[in-house]
């Protein structure tokens, strides 16, 4: 503590280790800080600049790569987690009703607020987040900084719900940006990977509380391919879990509802005994008898879902939005997720099935299930809203809002700007609102479990998975365990590998990154991102984790 500036000691923690939630990487920063207000964050930035330190800002640590690893200063905003302002937006008064309907509420929160904390606040106030990913453990800043998404034909990245953001630059100045005010900063901060500044406040467009009515069906793999063109457009929300060794999938589709709550069917591995038994079987198949893996999947699938195709029947449930959209991610895991155009899905899945089948027959490698298959509508007009006088606005038009009810499908967006580092394919935006598969992005998530926190070999499977996705025009999710490509001659592979191993990584899940293709992938958007980065951080205070950023071509000279 002797080398910590006096002004920072009131909010330095006793914690000495930072690790990912999955336990895949860990580091020992020089100090871990938990500021409680903007002034303390400003002081942290000031002292970092004066002492030549870098700052890594972290939340829940759910990114399983070395993205957040540092040997310098680390900032956690868990104590900076208050709801500050509610701004309700009403429909016009009806001649027969003196109580106007609330269409949405813009909620301003401190950036360290965890999503589960926000969900609890919203529930108490009869509100809800419009679209969620699979978990609610992240902070609101972390949620938007890495490109989190759900699974729906109508919604894009979760950052689509963000109206405005405040952040501190390396001079400690508080900057406000939105689709109307400093839109170039807004597009950078909406997927910043922590390299633009420290987010302090987020204004999120929330909606009246709603429930989710879902139908869960068991279908054969061939049924999925045969119905591919229609499945994605039949409901507001959709998720598919593919279990390759059973040749079956779980198809989950849902819409907003006003029906009374009705619990989903009991979960076998949702019980303590079922969960422990499943993880034990995984441990045995990973470390002792890999060829048992297909039999473990078949057994667990039968216990959890049965073995009969139920297309058209299925299990019905009505849940609150959070319970309906979140899911149980089970155990510590490696996760490799890529996006591609939805229309390439059948070809991708057919090729992946052949790879998995061939590998299991030779014993070369085995995969874990499920492989998650999702979609999002990540298309943008790249323009702000306009009001009745055709002036730029943060709000959709009254005419558009007047046609919406509490159960209307799709979002009331906070913005319609594409983040510079959005790694989904650029697909055509439809101004008339009609959605087709041509506009939808496919997300495929390959998961390998780490039973009881132990490691499993991933490189063979993940490399083939990435080859297939890359060939289909895909790109990786920034926060996941992707491998990447062989680098150019300037890349010091041994030094990079050494750095990853020093952070607790293992040779069989280290990353090569995507520097060779980044400029081809992002072009002028990457240039624009770096222009903003250099303006907001000329001193390099936020270049913590620089090795990861350079490995993936995020930084331009």
UniProtKB/Swiss-Prot annotation:
Give the Pfam families listed for this entry: ALO, FAD_binding_4
Residue numbers bearing the Pros-8alpha-FAD histidine modification:
62
The enzyme's E.C. designation: 1.1.3.37, 1.1.3.8, 1.3.3.12
GO CC terms, sorted: mitochondrion; plasma membrane
**Phenotype upon gene inactivation:** Abolishes D-arabinono-1,4-lactone oxidase activity and impairs the production of D-erythroascorbic acid. Leads to increased sensitivity towards oxidative stress, defective hyphal growth and attenuated virulence.
Q: Which PROSITE patterns match?
A: FAD_PCMH, OX2_COVAL_FAD
Similarity-based family: Belongs to the oxygen-dependent FAD-linked oxidoreductase family.
Q: Write down what this protein is called.
A: D-arabinono-1,4-lactone oxidase
Q: Which gene does this sequence derive from?
A: ALO1
């Amino acid at each position: 503590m002797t080398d910590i500036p006096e002004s920072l000691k009131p909010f330095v923690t006793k914690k000495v280790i930072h690790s990912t939630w999955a336990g895949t990487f860990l580091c020992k920063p020089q100090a871990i800080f938990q500021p409680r207000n903007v002034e303390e964050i400003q002081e942290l930035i000031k002292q970092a600049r004066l002492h030549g330190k870098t700052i890594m800002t972290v939340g829940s640590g759910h990114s399983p790569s070395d993205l957040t690893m540092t040997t310098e200063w680390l900032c956690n905003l868990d104590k900076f987690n208050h709801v500050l302002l509610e701004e309700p937006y009403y429909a016009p008064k009806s001649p027969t009703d003196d109580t106007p309907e609330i269409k949405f509420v813009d909620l301003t929160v401190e950036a360290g607020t965890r999503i589960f904390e926000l969900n609890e606040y919203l529930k108490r106030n009869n509100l809800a987040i419009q679209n969620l990913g699979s978990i609610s453990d992240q902070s609101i800043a972390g949620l938007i900084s890495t490109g989190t998404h759900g699974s729906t034909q109508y919604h894009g990245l979760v950052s689509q719900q963000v109206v405005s953001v405040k952040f501190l630059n390396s001079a400690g100045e508080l900057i406000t940006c939105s689709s109307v005010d400093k839109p170039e900063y807004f597009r950078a901060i909406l997927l910043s990977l922590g390299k633009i500044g420290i987010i302090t406040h987020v204004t999120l467009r929330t909606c009246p509380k709603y429930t989710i009515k879902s139908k869960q069906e068991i279908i054969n793999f061939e049924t999925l391919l045969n119905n591919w063109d229609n499945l994605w457009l039949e409901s507001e929300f959709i998720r598919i879990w593919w279990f390759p060794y059973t040749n079956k999938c779980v198809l989950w589709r849902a819409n907003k509802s006003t029906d009374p709550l009705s619990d989903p069917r009991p979960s076998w591995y949702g019980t303590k005994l079922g969960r422990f038994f499943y993880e034990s079987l995984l441990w045995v198949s990973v470390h002792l008898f890999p060829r048992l893996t297909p039999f473990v999947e078949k057994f667990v699938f039968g216990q959890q879902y049965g073995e009969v195709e139920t297309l058209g029947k299925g299990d019905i449930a009505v849940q609150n939005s959070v319970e309906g959209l979140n899911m149980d991610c089970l155990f510590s895991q490696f996760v490799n997720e890529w996006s591609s155009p939805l229309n390439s899905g059948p070809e991708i899945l057919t090729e992946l099935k052949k790879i998995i089948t061939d590998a299991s027959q030779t014993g070369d490698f085995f995969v874990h299930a499920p492989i998650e298959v999702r979609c999002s509508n990540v298309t943008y007009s790249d323009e702000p809203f306009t009001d009745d006088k055709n002036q730029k606005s943060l709000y959709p038009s009254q005419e558009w809002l007047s046609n919406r009810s509490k159960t209307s499908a799709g979002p009331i967006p906070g913005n319609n700007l594409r983040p510079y580092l959005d790694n989904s394919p650029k697909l055509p935006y439809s101004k008339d609102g009609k959605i087709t598969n041509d506009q939808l992005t496919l997300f495929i998530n390959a998961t390998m479990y780490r039973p009881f926190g132990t490691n499993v070999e991933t490189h063979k499977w993940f490399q083939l998975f990435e080859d297939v996705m890359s060939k289909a025009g895909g790109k990786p999710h920034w926060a996941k365990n992707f491998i990447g490509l062989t680098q150019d001659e300037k890349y010091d592979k041994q030094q990079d590998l050494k750095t990853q191993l020093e952070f607790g990584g293992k040779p069989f899940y280290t990353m090569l990154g995507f520097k060779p293709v980044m400029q081809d992938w992002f072009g002028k958007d990457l240039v624009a991102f770096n222009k903003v980065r250099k303006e907001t951080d000329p001193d390099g205070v936020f270049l913590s984790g620089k090795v990861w950023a350079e490995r993936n071509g995020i930084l331009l000279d």
